[in-house]
């Protein structure tokens, strides 16, 4: 059993079986999964109470890979020194961890002697981070998606042969997706009425999954069966293209509805994270008397960096539609994070509960 992180609600105990764990480990180790082999030295940069403790460690043991555990310190310096000491070539974690690592390496003009590949999940990885790791340090960044209820792995973004012929810019667009479902997992997107939506890369709907390691019940039956006609509702909003590559557009609880149009908080955050002065950013919706909701962006600046509200809002011009640009920038000392490193937007909303939009 593993408890959910409680990022969007109360933690629930997810029940696993020996069979589901073995099947998940086998599928995760496949070439179109996490590509785990005995040649790897793997560092999962997550606490052992995290669901990844049910994933990579078992795939590593199954294939004979070296498994390196992080210590209590999750800062960039500690992670870098551990990677170098143990010759880690494959690591996995959430974007906040890799941002700290990247900042440490950049600030100290360091290089990676062994790291070849990192898998990023938990939340969307900013394009600027993928580009920096790949272009500057030669480290492949692989997007993956999953959740505690999926043991956790559901999709991995491994490029197909035809993608290797694309330009770097076009390849980045593919790498930004969460990828194709691994062997054993089925997925689909549906509209509000539960009708299947097409895999055209345009239609956007609620993401549902099923498979032999997908949760069918919670500890003590909390909340009843989570399944709907055999499918697990993930709480994510996504698109799926013709090649089966899925892209999370937002959590259903985080998407912002403004004037009848949906605004992806992830897209707004990714643009802010591309600014050289921004260390971390979180987008939330604020009630608006006319438009229902409007986005604002909470920003934590990099150490010794300086940027104004006006400069950040100007940074969005040409990168987002005018109606998608945040109405305001709120500078914060820190953005609330959970024990697994994921942003806790519920706490951020609580901190900003008395905030009022300009000109309202």
Residue ranges: model-predicted function:
Residues 1-23:
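Conserved AMP-binding A3 loop
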Residues 181-208, 242-243, 305-309, 344:
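Conserved beta-loop-beta connector loops within the AMP-binding
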Residues 22-41, 49-89, 104, 155, ...:
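Conserved AMP-binding/adenylation subdomain of ANL enzymes
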Residues 138, 168-175, 195, 200-202, ...:
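Conserved ANL (AMP-binding/adenylate-forming) active-site segment centered on the GW(Y/F)…HTG consensus within
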Residues 45-50, 123:
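Conserved AMP-binding
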Residues 62, 85-93, 102-173, 186, ...:
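Gly/Ser/Thr-rich phosphate-binding loop
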Residues 4-7, 15, 42, 48, ...:
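Conserved S/T- and glycine-rich ATP-binding loop of Class I adenylate-forming
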Residues 91, 211, 216-217, 237-324, ...:
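AMP-binding/adenylate-forming catalytic core of the ANL superfamily
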